[in-house]
Amino acid sequence: MAVTMLQDWCRWMGVNARRGLLILGIPEDCDDAEFQESLEAALRPMGHFTVLGKAFREEDNATAALVELDREVNYALVPREIPGTGGPWNVVFVPRCSGEEFLGLGRVFHFPEQEGQMVESVAGALGVGLRRVCWLRSIGQAVQPWVEAVRCQSLGVFSGRDQPAPGEESFEVWLDHTTEMLHVWQGVSERERRRRLLEGLRGTALQLVHALLAENPARTAQDCLAALAQVFGDNESQATIRVKCLTAQQQSGERLSAFVLRLEVLLQKAMEKEALARASADRVRLRQMLTRAHLTEPLDEALRKLRMAGRSPSFLEMLGLVRESEAWEASLARSVRAQTQEGAGARAGAQAVARASTKVEAVPGGPGREPEGLLQAGGQEAEELLQEGLKPVLEECDN
């Protein structure tokens, strides 16, 4: 979803999202001078702005740019599109409001005017005197940008892939948001609703809707959404979801606690579809942990003892055991690193002292002659320091 991308990018850059604009659809061959000129022409009424960065979006096959304003977005002045190379560039900003409360006000103050009615008639219907008509008109003008911001909010991106690509949404998330937006777009023409729906589709999903509309151009956006739900919705059979539960295993690089959470999602789904009895969920969870996960020796031993005793941990109990095991592993790793660093430092110090002992300076008493006692003392001292430095390492080896 473009608004989510804007918010995440602003958060990463440390910028207030309400002062940020996301410009989408910029061609790769658009040079910086042309880009800056187009922005200045379109955003001049918004005041000073700064381009914070650019990134290529594969789903659009175009570049996106993050722009920071010197003040919060003025919803009455911000353009929805910027004329530029390759066609208009879309402008995304954080809506000032969301929800039906302002949409309701929009219906009161906006739609009557579209239908040729006067604000005065609305005032009369609300039981407000004509002297307050100007007040009502000002409220309508103030609310309208908020309503328009909600109505013009774009959909997220769904392509039909099993694993959504970066910038795409899973079907469940996309379906929830799209269903809500179709309700918000009640005052928009059906043709425009279909166009906005197609904007949020890529790949297989887009091809499917194109085929549906080619077969029957009169299909509504709601009809197309229902068809997408039939194809990409959760239609797994009991046998399929049961197999997924019984074959789930910890992936390479996946934390054990993350596997427990992923396995629980599958178990809950299987129980909802009655592919797995609730009474057997704990037993299946324990079996998958013992056969499909990478366990530390203490945790493996503890779980096997529980199975032999006929005591299968619940989800929360299993998660608690796993997190204790992960904490123990982390503590052990820190301890090993600390001992290794301490031993390395001691060895380096001992070696330095040993080298220094071989370079005892000559004293008066003959060229090339060195006092025997000094050599013996230096050698003995170096040996003592060496033994002292290696002591932690030797103890570690003994242990």
Curated annotation (Swiss-Prot):
Expressed in the brain. Belongs to the PNMA family. It comes from the Eukaryota. Transmembrane segments: none annotated. Pfam families: PNMA, PNMA_N. This is Paraneoplastic antigen-like protein 6A. The lineage of its organism: Eukaryota, Metazoa, Chordata, Craniata, Vertebrata. It comes from Homo sapiens (Human). Coiled coil: none annotated.
